[in-house]
């Protein structure tokens, strides 16, 4: 018989490594910046372990795998080792890791516990019980296989010998080689016998094997005469035996008597140079496979997501009854379904979570999805259902059309929840759940804003007080105190010096004039624009006097409280793009002017760093879900009058990355299109750089009848008869407002889909009329929606229209150039969006325009603060008013947020409580802790 063919593991492993190197390059081309990651955790300092690890690190480097070696001391305890295992499990840059065995520690460590703490999806050694169990069950495509058996199988396949139907004998039953080798051969359809130290007549059992794999750790235990002629022999052993002919006095042999066996076998592995190189190659292959699985799971593509099926009832139950009839998915599960990593999600219980900004950094190279903004016609006081339409649309796109889709909505103020409004999270079968969480504290963002805002207010009045009661020198000594004999400026004080043109860093080097300029802000109390805030409707805080305690030495002034969401910090949160950007915006917030007319900022007050600390968690978007299980970001809730009325840029950006290029992100703009949509485009999109693909314009028969001359609609009172009976004439006359809002949207170059939010009293004839007129006047489409009563199914036609519109050509453009004067920018909005003949800047507004321009704020975008109940400044004028001049009473600046807001009329920033507030109905069941009466 001819000598056996040599199975050279070095040659085969080199081929595998070259293939892996190509695969790594391909992954990096698909996802720039991505690198497969391998970590090796070692305890102790065994020489043999060090040798093996160095071989693995070198192989990883050659292939392009980022390998990390974590070496713990011999004093490590089991709990310390487990902490490292857990941290590697949570590290998204590590796609596979191994614990180098044996664990060389002075302390007793349960090796099995350490191995089984490894996340199975990162267990590239294939040693966890879960991977071993999957291998035993034959789930070869859903597990990692121990590297040595996997390498042995590759060598067997190299022979060309068919495994299926052959009799394979495995000598050895270790968890690392023998046992998994048995399973691997079995599921490759061999008939397998496993032999071990208790096997009788071992030589006879070995002689039956067409394929023989030996892993006993006994030098040359298997003799040549035992081997069946023509067998394939795989020798996994590495043993050292004495050899006087070798320089070190020993040689390496396998578990098989090689010289004898090669005369009987058809193929045989040498030792060394056989199985050893394959083990390392298979570790690299498993790491690359793990990285590929990671990419497949987390790169944009169709989500594998479970939707909730609605149990629709007629008549439609109350919002809270519907909300409680649907059990939300665990928010951690939803996060995984949409491609978020564990370390990118901070859970707040089972139904809400914060998403870290690191997700945006990870996905920065991924293309964005389609961007849809939901707005409406000029509403009745009852609202026309923008929020409900937003949620219904995403439920339709997700649960019914199986598109990746995200809703991005504002967080409601808690004040109105207990006042006149009650809860708000959509309605009917189109809601965000749980509604109790949505409407109350959520994750504390508004509380953080309240704390930050009031810290600024306290800093302003304290600074005025201290400047009035101290000399320059005393003030300077307290601002820059000597600590242990050393006096130095803080970082924020250094920045103030630079703004003043003072380049010195030694406090002792300042002149008297420089001390005066540095220490005194010289705030003019009459110019203070910063107010304290509270997230409670309290009319008696609309005007207050502060400083009446004797300790304030008579330094009183008139001030007020606003509701928390009216704070500029809320607008900053909504418009910021990163933690660094938020820090800069908070510092830029102007709170007053000095007596010389210079703007005083939070950076001047020295408080901007502290504000950032208070807001560090609030910047992370809040993840919730709809009734049908689609994801929702609830983040930021600025007023839609004195601010821009849109949810956060950060939430939109993360969502656009997560849905991928074929997915949709649907966000809502407050009030009608003339206010919320205009600000969405000219402020939010200007700062974000994002370009919307579709405008969804919500309209109701009810609102059109009002604009057509119908009776007054009053919140809390029954609708007049005209609104519950068919009246085509009123609808057609009122269409003028919808026509104008379609025109407004198209002015920005974006396709418009009209969503006719249907009520049970609306007739098909009325809805058909609205649809026809909308299409005739430039709408891409107009569709009837019944999502309040039917959930996503009721918005299916709308979703399909949005899909089509997103493919239509668009040419997005902003309305005005920032370089124009403040007056000209206001005029463009008034004339083009509202239909005014002109504007009139009243004296105070004229003065402010000049001051802000002089202070360098004239190039900010404009955020008009006017009534949402009319296109004009008069809420009683419905339809499309003409022939009016828009009066601008005042202009104020939100410099940190980044806009000027002209006041048209009087804007209330602190709601009051009605005679019968909603809190009469709100209570808690002490046994179930269920909130009652919120909706």
UniProtKB/Swiss-Prot annotation:
It comes from the Eukaryota. The keyword Cytoplasm applies. Gene3D superfamilies: Domain 2, N(10)-formyltetrahydrofolate synthetase, Formyltetrahydrofolate synthetase, domain 3, Leucine Dehydrogenase, chain A, domain 1, NAD(P)-binding Rossmann-like Domain, P-loop containing nucleotide triphosphate hydrolases. It catalyses: (6R)-5,10-methylene-5,6,7,8-tetrahydrofolate + NADP(+) = (6R)-5,10-methenyltetrahydrofolate + NADPH; (6R)-5,10-methenyltetrahydrofolate + H2O = (6R)-10-formyltetrahydrofolate + H(+); (6S)-5,6,7,8-tetrahydrofolate + formate + ATP = (6R)-10-formyltetrahydrofolate + ADP + phosphate. It is found in: Cytoplasm. The modification N-acetylmethionine is found at residue 1. Residues 310-935 are annotated as: Formyltetrahydrofolate synthetase domain. Signal peptide: none annotated. The modification Phosphoserine is found at residues 318, 413, 490. One of its GO terms (cellular component) is cytosol. Keywords: Acetylation, Amino-acid biosynthesis, ATP-binding, Cytoplasm, Histidine biosynthesis, Hydrolase, Ligase, Methionine biosynthesis, Multifunctional enzyme, NADP, Nucleotide-binding, One-carbon metabolism, Oxidoreductase, Phosphoprotein, Purine biosynthesis. The active site is at residue 56. SUPFAM superfamilies: Aminoacid dehydrogenase-like, N-terminal domain, NAD(P)-binding Rossmann-fold domains, P-loop containing nucleoside triphosphate hydrolases. Substrate binds at residues 52-56, 99-101, 272-276. GO terms for biological process: 10-formyltetrahydrofolate biosynthetic process; heart development; L-histidine biosynthetic process; methionine biosynthetic process; methionine metabolic process; neural tube closure; neutrophil homeostasis; one-carbon metabolic process. ATP binds at residues 380-387. Residues 2-291 are annotated as: Methylenetetrahydrofolate dehydrogenase and methenyltetrahydrofolate cyclohydrolase (D/C) domain. Pathway: One-carbon metabolism; tetrahydrofolate interconversion. The N-terminal methylenetetrahydrofolate dehydrogenase and methenyltetrahydrofolate cyclohydrolase (D/C) domain carries both the methylenetetrahydrofolate dehydrogenase and methenyltetrahydrofolate cyclohydrolase activities. In the N-terminal section; belongs to the tetrahydrofolate dehydrogenase/cyclohydrolase family. In the C-terminal section; belongs to the formate--tetrahydrofolate ligase family. Homodimer. Trifunctional enzyme that catalyzes the interconversion of three forms of one-carbon-substituted tetrahydrofolate: (6R)-5,10-methylene-5,6,7,8-tetrahydrofolate, 5,10-methenyltetrahydrofolate and (6S)-10-formyltetrahydrofolate. These derivatives of tetrahydrofolate are differentially required in nucleotide and amino acid biosynthesis, (6S)-10-formyltetrahydrofolate being required for purine biosynthesis while (6R)-5,10-methylene-5,6,7,8-tetrahydrofolate is used for serine and methionine biosynthesis for instance. This is C-1-tetrahydrofolate synthase, cytoplasmic. It comes from Rattus norvegicus.
């Amino acid at each position: 018989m001819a000598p056996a063919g040599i199975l050279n593991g070095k040659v085969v492993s080199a081929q595998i490594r070259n293939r892996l190197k190509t695969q790594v390059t391909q992954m990096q081309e698909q996802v720039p910046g991505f690198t497969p990651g391998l970590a090796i955790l070692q305890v102790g300092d065994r020489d043999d372990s060090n040798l093996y690890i160095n071989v693995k690190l070198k192989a990883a480097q050659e292939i392009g795998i980022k390998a990390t070696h974590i070496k713990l001391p011999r004093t490590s305890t089991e709990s310390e080792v487990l902490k490292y295992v857990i941290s590697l499990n949570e590290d998204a840059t590590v796609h596979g890791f191994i614990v180098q065995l044996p664990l060389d520690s002075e302390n007793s460590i349960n090796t099995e516990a350490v191995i089984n703490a490894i996340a199975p999806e990162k267990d590239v050694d294939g040693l966890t019980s879960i991977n071993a169990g999957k291998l035993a069950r034959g789930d070869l495509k859903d597990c990692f296989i121990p590297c040595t058996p996997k390498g042995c199988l590759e060598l067997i396949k190299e022979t060309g010998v068919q495994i299926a139907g052959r009799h394979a004998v495995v000598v050895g039953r270790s968890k690392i080689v023998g046992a998994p080798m048995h399973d691997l051969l079995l599921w490759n359809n061999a008939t397998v016998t496993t032999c071990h130290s208790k096997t009788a007549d071992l030589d006879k059992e070995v002689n039956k094997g067409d394929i023989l794999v030996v892993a006993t750790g006994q030098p040359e235990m298997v003799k040549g005469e035992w081997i069946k002629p023509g067998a394939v022999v795989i020798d996994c052993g590495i043993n050292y035996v004495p050899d006087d002919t070798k320089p070190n006095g020993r040689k390496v042999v396998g578990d098989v008597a090689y010289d004898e066996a090669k005369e009987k076998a058809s193929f045989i592995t040498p030792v060394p140079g056989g199985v050893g190189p394959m083990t390392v190659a298979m570790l690299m292959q498993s790491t690359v496979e793990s990285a590929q699985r990671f990419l497949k799971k987390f790169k944009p593509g169709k989500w594998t997501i479970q939707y909730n099926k609605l149990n629709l009832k007629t008549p439609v139950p109350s919002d809270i009854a519907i909300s409680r009839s649907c059990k939300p998915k665990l928010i951690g599960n939803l996060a995984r379904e949409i491609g978020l990593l564990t370390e990118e999600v901070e859970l707040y219980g089972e139904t809400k979570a914060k998403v870290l900004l690191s997700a945006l950094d990870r996905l920065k190279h991924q293309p964005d999805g389609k961007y849809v903004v939901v707005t409406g016609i000029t509403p009745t006081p009852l609202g026309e259902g923008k929020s409900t339409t937003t949620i219904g649309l995403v439920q339709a796109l997700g649960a019914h059309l199986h598109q990746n889709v995200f809703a991005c909505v504002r967080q409601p103020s808690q004040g109105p929840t207990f006042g006149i409004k009650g809860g708000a999270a959509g309605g009917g079968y189109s809601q965000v759940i749980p509604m109790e969480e949505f409407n109350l504290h959520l994750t504390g963002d508004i509380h953080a804003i309240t704390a930050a805002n009031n810290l600024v207010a306290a800093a302003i009045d304290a600074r005025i007080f201290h400047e009035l009661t101290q000399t320059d020198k005393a003030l300077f000594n307290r601002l820059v105190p000597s600590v242990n004999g050393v006096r130095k400026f803080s970082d924020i004080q250094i920045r103030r010096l630079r703004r003043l043109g003072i380049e010195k860093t030694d406090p002792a080097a300042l002149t008297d004039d420089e001390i005066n300029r540095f220490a005194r802000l010289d705030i003019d109390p009459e110019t203070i624009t910063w107010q304290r805030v509270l997230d409670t409707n309290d009319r008696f805080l609309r005007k207050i006097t502060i400083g009446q305690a004797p300790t304030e030495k008579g330094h009183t002034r008139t001030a007020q409280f606003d509701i928390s969401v009216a704070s500029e910090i809320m607008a900053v949160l909504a418009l910021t793009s990163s933690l660094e950007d938020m820090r800069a915006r908070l510092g830029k917030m102007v709170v007053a002017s000095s007596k010389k007319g210079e703007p005083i900022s939070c950076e001047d007050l020295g408080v901007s760093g502290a504000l950032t600390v208070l807001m560090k968690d609030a910047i992370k978007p809040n993840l919730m879900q709809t009734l049908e299980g689609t994801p929702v970001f609830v983040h930021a809730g600025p007023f839609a009058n004195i601010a821009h009325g849109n949810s956060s840029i950060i939430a939109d950006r993360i969502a656009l990355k997560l849905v991928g290029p074929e997915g949709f992100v649907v966000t809502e703009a407050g009030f009608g299109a003339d206010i919320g949509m205009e600000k969405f485009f000219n402020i939010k999109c200007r700062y974000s750089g994002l370009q919307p693909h579709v405008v969804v314009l919500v309209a109701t028969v009810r609102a059109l009848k009002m604009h057509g001359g119908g009776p007054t609609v009053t919140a809390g009172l029954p609708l007049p008869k005209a609104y519950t009976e068919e009246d085509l004439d009123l609808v057609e006359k009122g269409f003028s407002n919808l026509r104008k809002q379609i025109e407004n949207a198209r002015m920005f170059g974006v396709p418009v889909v009209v969503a006719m939010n249907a009520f049970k009293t609306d007739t098909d004839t009325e809805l058909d009329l609205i649809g026809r007129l909308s299409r005739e006047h430039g709408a891409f489409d107009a569709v009837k929606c019944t999502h309040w009563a039917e959930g996503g199914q009721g918005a299916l036609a709308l979703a399909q229209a949005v899909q089509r519109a997103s493919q239509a050509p668009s040419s997005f453009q902003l309305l005005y150039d920032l370089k124009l004067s403040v007056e000209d920018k206001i005029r463009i909005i008034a004339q083009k969006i509202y239909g005014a003949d002109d504007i009139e800047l009243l004296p105070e507004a004229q003065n402010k325009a000049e001051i802000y321009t002089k202070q360098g704020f004239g190039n900010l975008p404009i955020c008009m603060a006017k009534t949402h109940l009319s296109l004009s400044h008069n809420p009683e004028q419905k339809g499309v008013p003409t022939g009016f001049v828009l009066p601008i009473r005042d202009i104020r600046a939100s410099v940190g947020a980044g806009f000027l807001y002209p006041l048209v009329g009087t804007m209330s920033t602190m709601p009051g409580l009605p005679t019968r507030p909603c809190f009469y109905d709100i209570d808690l069941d002490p046994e179930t802790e269920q909130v009652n009466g919120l909706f």
